[in-house]
Amino acid sequence: MRRKLCTLVLALILVLTCAIGFVACDPTTDEPVDETPTHLDYFDFDGKTLMVWIGDSIAEGIVGPSPLSERENYAYYAMLGKGNDFTYVNKSVSGWKSGQLLTYLTDNAYKDDEAAFTTELLQRADIIELSILGNDLLQDNLGKLLVMTCQYLEEMEEKGESDKLDYVNDILFNDVYQYAGYNDAEKALGKVKGELNPNNSTDNFAAIIERLYDLNPDVTLLVQTVYNPIFDTSTLVLEQPITYVDADGTTKCWNDDTRTTREILLEDYGVTPAEYRELGDFLIELMNNIVRDYAEDHPGTIEVVEIHDRFMEYHNADTSEGQAYSRRLFSQDYIHPSNEGHAMIADVTQDKLVELGLAGANYLAEIKAIRCEQLDRMFSYAGSPVDVAAAKAAINNATTAYEANLAYFNAITRPEYFDEVANRNGDRAYPIFTYVVPNYANNK
């Protein structure tokens, strides 16, 4: 009995000692100071730069990097974190629109342990990179928005409007984009009536930036623009054809037409599949201008990372196979970036870090090491279709990270082309680029 009592007393003393250890006095005031560990006390920063990513699925890097087990080598946040020798944390959530991110940052309903951890990270971060706004557009009915855009542009021509940009901002933006947020005409037009529309992308974006600076006034804040993922067969634009089963059991398209309803509607406005990308870019750039306009109106607050422009430059410069190679930047859902797309986003962000004097000194060497390690671990086995030695030589001879990544992806990309599995029309097939499947079991 005495032994049990002694054990209990010792345990109580130990607990009290630990608790007292978390409280100290401020030497200038003799007031007690709470030294209870926070989430960040479990990080070993070791004097390194802390970079935090927050935003949507593009930043989260769950959809796109393939195989997912290589996310920490393919996703752009990891490439930048490792390559610059940063302490890095990704707090992005797939599917987030601007309103959801704003709510997460401000609403008391989200003040759980995970949200508290995110807040502490944002307060401590040296650099934050934000990826948002893409879902405000792409997660809604993009095909419908394209048709509505055609309608508005036609009205503009009929009315003889001279200033296309003003017309689009005043009419298209207020109507179409707020429909995208609400899908309810009365609520969507609330802002036009002078009421605050909490689902408006422009207002949300401004509030997000202000909130981040409230949390961390000294942070360097990078904001990505949204790339254009639209091609002539984009599932973002085209719904499936309307079909019916004939009396003999044969599935047929309505009106014996393999085109979808939306294809027909767009064609009525003189828009061919080859022009979907241009029309889609018209909408995407309206969304990107929210970021650019904020940067111009609030100088010194955000650094714009022009993902859109770099992707577009690559697309416009690529004329091989009817500009097919620019599709390598996208995963097979043709929405999210592929491994190669993530590498390009990393390149653009790294250029900005270099411009700001925030980049690590050994980025190129680190990227080369990552790619060579992957080659050795995943593709160096008997019978491998990848010439590992040649690929490593090309990587090590590269003078930029872009060249090193390109050498790697060229080596592991299969040369065969595959038609889209669910392609509706043979003459609308396009190549799908796939990677050599890693063989972890048989590597040397």
Protein language model features and the residues they cover:
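Bacterial N-terminal signal peptides that target proteins for export
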Residues: 1-9
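C-terminal motif of bacterial Sec signal peptides marking the signal peptidase cleavage site
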Residues: 21-24
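Serine-esterase "nucleophile elbow" of acetyl-processing enzymes
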Residues: 32-94, 119-120, 150, 416
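Structural recognition of the beta-strand scaffold that forms the well-ordered cores
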Residues: 50-55, 59-61, 87-92, 126-131, ...
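Substrate-gating cap/lid alpha-helix
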Residues: 231-307
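Histidine-centered active-site loop/cap adjacent to the catalytic His
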Residues: 326-366
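Beta-rich interaction/scaffold domains
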Residues: 365-444
